[in-house]
Amino acid sequence: MSQVQSGILPEHCRAAIWIEANVKGEVDALRAASKTFADKLATFEAKFPDAHLGAVVAFGNNIWRALSGGVGAEELKDFPGYGKGLAPTTQFDVLIHILSLRHDVNFSVAQAAMEAFGDCIEVKEEIHGFRWVEERDLSGFVDGTENPAGEETRREVAVIKDGVDAGGSYVFVQRWEHNLKQLNRMSVHDQEMMIGRTKEANEEIDGDERPETSHLTRVDLKEDGKGLKIVRQSLPYGTASGTHGLYFCAYCARLHNIEQQLLSMFGDTDGKRDAMLRFTKPVTGGYYFAPSLDKLMAL
């Protein structure tokens, strides 16, 4: 069985760092840097076992085709953006995702990543996420209630089982900026109708009682009676005095599942848009492919 990169399956991490970058040099330098970083990561994982450290190196479409010779990741493409600009694209070449129970360890690993990749990449965005009270989003609603639980279930959803991409996963990242003043002008009832759950108790509102535009309705999708599940590794980010929101991060064995949720949220299926756009907006978006650790080391 191909070994999955260690940042895909962990649950309940308390902190994360996401780094998106473009490639500056030759892909051979990127190959070598990826292996160097994987070796450094293994050293940190052994040094801090209680941190439950994990990380992922993933690649955008053009770079993956160059690295793999055009083999595998058939669903991978540049993030096109959705909703006629509501969900903009900021597609980059490389994504590095680091997560654990300790921000200090994450930061050390991020420094090691910068040393490993050096001048072969140009960092375009670096975001530090944190677990908030009771695993809630900054809106006050619990985030990720329907996230698959347990390693076996999460593996079933997030990891490609067999074939040339076995052990790999498709990744989507999207940074959302919240306007909490706008949210707080709404009554709690209106907020709950917008999300599709009660705010304090985190109870699902019955489908016939919540609007078609509620967030829950837009993303709780089924095909042939089976839910289009994803594994979320999202966290709040930002500063109290400035920009803040949710860094959305999803892994899935099928890019299809992620894309169908986005099409539904941004009105590209039936013209109805996710009501949470009333107080928050996405400002970035990128699709990536995370190969198995075995394949990463053999690039």
Curated annotation (Swiss-Prot):
Changing L246W: Lacks both peroxidase and dye-decolorizing activities. Keywords: Cytoplasm, Heme, Iron, Metal-binding, Oxidoreductase, Peroxidase. Binds 1 heme b (iron(II)-protoporphyrin IX) group non-covalently. GO terms for molecular function: heme binding; metal ion binding; peroxidase activity. Its EC number is 1.11.1.-. Changing R232 to E/L: Lacks dye-decolorizing activity. Lacks peroxidase activity towards ABTS, but retains activity towards guaiacol and catechol. It comes from Escherichia coli O157:H7. It holds the Pfam family Dyp_perox_C. Its main location: cytoplasm. The keyword Aminoacyl-tRNA synthetase does not apply. SUPFAM superfamilies: Dimeric alpha+beta barrel. Belongs to the DyP-type peroxidase family. Has both general peroxidase activity and dye-decolorizing activity. Can catalyze the oxidation of 2,2'-azino-bis(3-ethylbenzothiazoline-6-sulphonic acid) (ABTS), and the phenolic compounds guaiacol and catechol. Also decolorizes the anthraquinone dye reactive blue 19 (RB19). One of its GO terms (cellular component) is cytosol. InterPro entries: Dimeric_a/b-barrel, Dyp_perox_C, Dyp_perox_N, Dyp_peroxidase. The gene is yfeX. It is found in: Cytoplasm. NCBIfam families: Dyp_perox_fam (TIGR01413). Heme binds at H215. Its cofactor is heme b. This is Dye-decolorizing peroxidase YfeX. It is an enzyme of class 1 (oxidoreductase). PROSITE patterns: DYP_PEROXIDASE (PS51404).
